[in-house]
Regions:
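Active-site-adjacent substrate-binding region
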Residues: 34-38, 42-94
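Acidic-enriched catalytic cores of C-N bond-cleaving enzymes acting on peptides and small amides
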Residues: 12-34
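Midchain, well-structured core segments that form catalytic/ion-binding scaffolds
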Residues: 1-15, 41
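Extended hydrophobic-aromatic, low-complexity segments
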Residues: 12-16, 68-70, 100-102
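His/Asp/Glu-rich mid-to-C-terminal helical/loop segments that flank catalytic regions of hydrolases
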Residues: 17-22, 93-129
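Alpha-helix N-cap and loop-to-helix initiation/capping positions
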Residues: 12-15, 48-51, 107-111
């Protein structure tokens, strides 16, 4: 079984890891069912560029007022790796039914078009300074 915790704050991630380990140990004591926890790749959360984020948020507010959310990405996306050396940010569009990182993931064409419009406007804002 694989668990993946995501948060922008390392103390939260560490606490989630501790709680999972405690839960596994308590379950083993209570039921006799043992499990081992192996921590795989862990990375420190990385903040995206605030000016890039602001440009995306401003463009989203123009194209989809009250229909966007500013959120951190806790995943180790390429942007998180790139952001350690270059300015970077991410723009997410909704997946149908909230299904993400699965072979059935899909996004409505209208949301893809809207995402492209937001991205184009954000890029223009960034280039104009």
């Amino acid at each position: 079984m694989l668990f993946q915790f995501r948060d922008s704050e390392m103390p939260v991630l560490e606490r989630l890891d501790t709680v999972l380990r405690e839960l596994v140990e308590e379950t083993a004591i209570r039921t006799g069912c043992r499990a081992e926890i192996e921590r795989t790749a862990t990375g420190k959360p990385w903040q995206m560029d605030s000016a890039f984020q602001a440009a995306i948020e401003n463009a989203a507010a123009r194209h989809a007022p009250d229909a966007y959310v500013r959120m951190p990405s806790g995943a180790s996306h390429d942007a998180q790796v790139v952001a350690r050396k270059l300015r970077a940010a991410m723009l997410f569009v909704p997946s149908i039914g909230g299904i993400s990182h699965h072979w059935t993931e899909n996004t409505d064409d209208a949301d893809l078009v809207l995402g492209c419009q937001v991205l184009a406007d954000a890029a223009e804002m960034i280039l104009r300074g």
